[in-house]
């Protein structure tokens, strides 16, 4: 809760990577609008490079998440699929848990957090069914994504 000289309001933080990309920007816009309608002010903590490769550059970018003033944050939304590093995501969660801040995982799952996940398997099934029944295609090829990625495996 931010308490200033003239104002008092709830604050939500959103942690992600790649807000400069249309898809991530759209998700942040929808989430921010929903939080604002509930009376929150929204702070966005964004890095430009995902943390998949553990490089000095990505470590430097990950330091943006250390700037979160947990004294004024009332809820933290984390988008782990954009961050692409369990270590970075776990570090953010550990700091938020220590400050007793509720965490919403958007498109991810973690113990002790409120998890919002997408049904990637069912959505692909619906698209394939549509292509077969409506467009009469019978000889289909598709790529599910990166081998070993849980969402890619779910599509298969």
Which residues fall in each region the model found?
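A short, compositionally biased domain-edge/stem linker segment
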Residues: 1-4
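Bacterial carbohydrate/catabolite-sensing allosteric modules
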Residues: 6-53, 62-77, 82-156
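Short, flexible loop motifs at catalytic/binding sites
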Residues: 59
């Amino acid at each position: 809760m931010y308490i200033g000289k003239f104002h008092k309001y709830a604050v939500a933080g959103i942690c992600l990577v790649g807000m400069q990309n249309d898809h991530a920007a759209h998700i942040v816009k929808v989430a921010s609008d929903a939080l604002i309608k509930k009376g929150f002010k929204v702070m966005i903590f964004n890095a430009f490079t995902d943390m998949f490769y553990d490089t000095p550059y990505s470590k430097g970018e990950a330091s943006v998440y250390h700037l979160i003033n947990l004294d004024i944050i009332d809820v933290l939304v984390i988008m782990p699929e954009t961050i692409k590093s369990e270590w970075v995501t776990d570090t953010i969660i550990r700091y938020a848990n220590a400050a007793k801040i509720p965490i919403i995982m958007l498109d991810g799952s973690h113990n002790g957090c409120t998890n919002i996940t997408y049904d990637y398997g069912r959505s692909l099934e619906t698209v394939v069914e549509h292509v077969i029944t409506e467009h009469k295609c019978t000889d289909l090829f598709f790529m599910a994504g990166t081998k070993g990625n849980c969402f890619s495996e779910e599509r298969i």
